[in-house]
Amino acid sequence: MSRVIGIDLGTTNSCVAVMEGGEPVVIANPEGNRTTPSVVAFKNGEKIVGEAAKRQAITNPDNTVISIKRHMGTSHKETLEGNEYTPQQISAMILQKLKSDAEAYLGESVTQAVITVPAYFNDSQRQATKDAGKIAGLEVLRIVNEPTAAALAYGMEKSEDQTVLVFDLGGGTFDVSILELSEGFFEVKATSGDNKLGGDDFDQVVMDYLVSEFKKEHGIDLSKDRMAQQRLKDAAEKAKKDLSGVLTTTISLPFITADATGPKHLEMNLTRAKFEELSSNLVERTMGPTRQALNDAGLTPNEIDKVILVGGSTRIPAVQEAIKKFTGKEPHKGVNPDEVVALGAAVQAGVLTGDVKDVVLLDVTPLSLGIETLGGVFTKLIDRNTTIPTSKSQVFSTAADNQPGVEIHVLQGERQMAADNKTLGRFNLNDIPPAPRGVPQIEVSFDIDANGIVNVRAKDLGTGKEQRITITASSGLSDEEIDRMVKEAELNAEADKQRKEQVEIRNEADQLVFTTEKTLKEVEGKVDQAEIDRANAAKDKVKKALEGGSIDEIKSAKDELSEIVQQISVKLYEQAAQAAGAAQGGAEGSAEPKKDNVVDADYEVVDDKK
């Protein structure tokens, strides 16, 4: 059975892990880093993902995508080099990279994964993540909430009963979950969050400040300059990270722009105090969901035993101070906030494959589910923080006499009116027999699976007629679209492979030309001139092919030159061997010369007995 990997598909960085010898292990990427930037770019038709994509973002901002996770489950499209891509396709490219890195590490093909999502992701965002996995060639065995995964990794070896608060502030999303842990039993009591709050927002307040200060000093608005914006983002992110360890940092961006008077440079000091002032409302925004989760769990801050920090943004001192002040407890720092979610996903993969035993995980649905009823009211069928998997049914009736059908409008959210909540989908139940209003009985059933994905069924109890759907949001992808994207991804993977092979062949040919020139200088005068002329002609043929020939022409010319050089080398060795043999024969023919005090060897054995 092939290995199942655990993937933390993050907004700014992603991480992949696997179970090794009963322990979850993070898989480093080829650059040696344990997390990979969630960045995708296209340059001259070539797809670039991860570290390399992030490095070239400054010079290629229009064809580089960052933080695509923020658009999952929406109809957003990215245009790169003239081609349109959905968030699912961009995410699939990141997943393909992680899959490839895992395969290189394990030395075998990987086809199955457990992928994490923010706990507060709605159904369409979860479905989009699952679709991204499918496009990347992965069967997604389970979608796991990020705070739950973190608790899994943290609680693996813990035997004592404890109530933990997982505070997860990542690059683009924020979640807080309350769990009860007890010897392999993980029960989520409540979860809350904000899908539009993360490290990107902390970067943005620094960027806005830099733009504002630069405009005051030079009268130039950098927010209109795409290349300057990318440099500012990188500088803001670096400053934010620096200020977690030092009290002041210098932001230096030479030649950030130019006007009629010449080039302009951005040089500025940023203190931790100023950064905390700029981001104070963001820190305060994390407290709302934290209070909500505690309230839903029916707990007070004093009843929390441990606070676990997850996500790179929890390194910000003001964030740590806020949660410490709220709970009255020093946050636990025994886990790596960048890696713990992927490690937990690997543990869940181990549970599903049977490699990890005696672990029971009970998660919850983050948002209430229901339908629209008369007057545009949102009628809940399943309340938020209900343990999943779960199902619930309720009987409704018609609102008008002789109503021939009903539209079931499925929603997710907490507001009283349907219009204020998130539409997951709509479907119709038709052919209801004529009857006065209130007489027909229509049973609506909701079913949420362990991935948090919703199935809805409507049944006319009078006729037994039934209609059911698995919710795919209006922004979701149809099966046909997913199949097309899977094929495109496979073709792109094949094209990437061919492009890599072509580069390797060109490099090999180039290297062969260099070594041939070196070899021909060394053998000059030692082999026939005709052989050297033949090799030079073949070498020139390779050079010409490299300048403008097809890859087949390069390969053919390279193989021809390689064979000629090998023949020259063989002849050279044969000549050397013959010369050595002749020298040895000559020495044997004069083996008994008379002693005339001439010593032929390096030394002479003297017989002391004489």
UniProtKB/Swiss-Prot annotation:
Acidic residues bias locations: 599-610
Induction: By stress conditions e.g. heat shock.
CDD domains, A to Z: ASKHA_NBD_HSP70_DnaK-like
Gene Ontology molecular function, alphabetical: ATP binding; ATP-dependent protein folding chaperone; unfolded protein binding
Keyword Methyltransferase tagged: no
Record-listed Phosphothreonine modification sites: T173
Region Disordered, residue ranges: 581-610
SUPFAM superfamilies listed in its UniProt record: Actin-like ATPase domain, Heat shock protein 70kD (HSP70), C-terminal subdomain, Heat shock protein 70kD (HSP70), peptide-binding domain
Xref: InterPro entries: ATPase_NBD (IPR043129), Chaperone_DnaK (IPR012725), Heat_shock_70_CS (IPR018181), HSP70_C_sf (IPR029048), HSP70_peptide-bd_sf (IPR029047), Hsp_70_fam (IPR013126)
Residue pairs linked by disulfide bridges in the UniProt entry: none
Alphabetic keyword roster: ATP-binding, Chaperone, Nucleotide-binding, Phosphoprotein, Stress response
PANTHER family in the cross-refs: HEAT SHOCK PROTEIN 70KDA
Function summary: Acts as a chaperone.
Similarity remark: Belongs to the heat shock protein 70 family.
Protein name per the record: Chaperone protein DnaK
